[in-house]
Amino acid sequence: MSAQLPIIVVGAGTAGCTVVSHLANNTDHPILVLEPGGYGNDDDPQFLNLSDTDLLRTSDDGYVQARAMGGGSAVNGLLLTGDEPEHLHGLTRYAHAQDIGSVGEALLALGGRFSRLWWNGGRWNPGRAVRHLMEENRVSWLPRSVTELLLDGDRVIGVDCNEEPLRAAAVVLCAGAIASPGILLASGAQKLNPMIGVGVQNHPTITAQFSLGAHLPARFDTAVVREWSTSAGGQMLNVGYERVAKNLDGVGALSVSLMNPISRGRVEISSNHMPHADFQYLAADEDLFNMVEGVRDLIRLLVDGKFTDDPESITVEGRPLVDVSAWDDDDMREWLRRSVRGVSHAASSCAQAVDSAGRVLGLDNCWIADASVLTHVPTETPAASVTMEALRIARNIGESLS
């Protein structure tokens, strides 16, 4: 690396790889990416084959986050429920009948549709481009986790990796909507910017499981979705899963998620500086109402659909379907408050902590370019929104440092 200080990009997930690729191709600055994760298999269409690898990390409170070059795009379920980003045209495709199994077929019969997939001859993973840049010596990589920022007053001058200081010309946080604010909080930056970590969201989700019996394997673990709206305007998403785990082909699943939640929480750090998110799922009455309606609809799908030949095998978050079906709305609300879960879609934890260019307010020389800065959790699977926002902020960074 030259004597010139590098731009340090913290995290090589979907956002980080997008930022690295743009800056490496559009600035003269050396680029150093810090990412503790390794590489996955971009040629395996069944994402659950990655579920027991070191490419995933589960926090003490159960939140699952990628730990891989390419981040969530290296390990996700491949669903792109929204539009294909213009700058990635041709790198995705729609699923078709040869891709799905019995669960997808049952959901199609109930109004589902084939989803667009982050797949076209292989998984779209922005980590591939970064890997090529590394092979060409245009980008440097260290397998490090950043613990905090190095500050000189309100100016960010580098990062600390477990007492290994690294100086930087600029720092771009792309560690995700929990880890990025966590790094800022561990650095004491909340004294300069009290909105760090405030407003985090996720998609509240309930999942049913059922026995599949004899069935043919599907090419993709999930490829069919169903979108609908509640009477109150809740945007709901059903996803069918052809299996629930790598070595559990005999069990399928059907989930329902609220895609436009109102409830917001915050990211905080523990006494040992580990970040965690309190999402405040269903804190807003509107969200609770929509999820009650969502579960009622899920029950109807499970009863009317041909998901299983063994109705007694159906459970909803571990409770027999017959029990859940019998509850009145009060019982359902009480159960939902205890049982609702999230998915790996954390967003918006720093939307109020940055300016329109992605600069962290109160700090000089520091940007955030990941899902943290989205104004709300996307109403579709989030990778498209994340990569578009990361590219926008990367362009801003490139212009400001040129």
Role assignments for model-derived ranges:
Residues 1-90, 191-224:
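N-terminal glycine-rich phosphate/pyrophosphate-binding loop and immediately adjacent elements
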Residues 8-10, 34, 146, 165-185:
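Short hydrophobic core segments
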Residues 18, 170, 181-263, 289, ...:
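Mid-to-C-terminal "cap/lid" subdomains and adjacent gly/pro-rich loops that border
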Residues 33-34, 141, 368-369:
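Short hydrophobic beta-strand that contains or immediately precedes a catalytic carboxylate
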Residues 44-109, 113, 123, 254-276:
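Redox-cofactor-proximal catalytic regions of oxidoreductases
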Residues 77, 85-156, 162, 309-340, ...:
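Conserved redox-cofactor binding core of oxidoreductases
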Residues 278-289, 297-402:
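C-terminal lid/capping helical subdomain adjacent to the catalytic/cofactor pocket in oxidative enzymes
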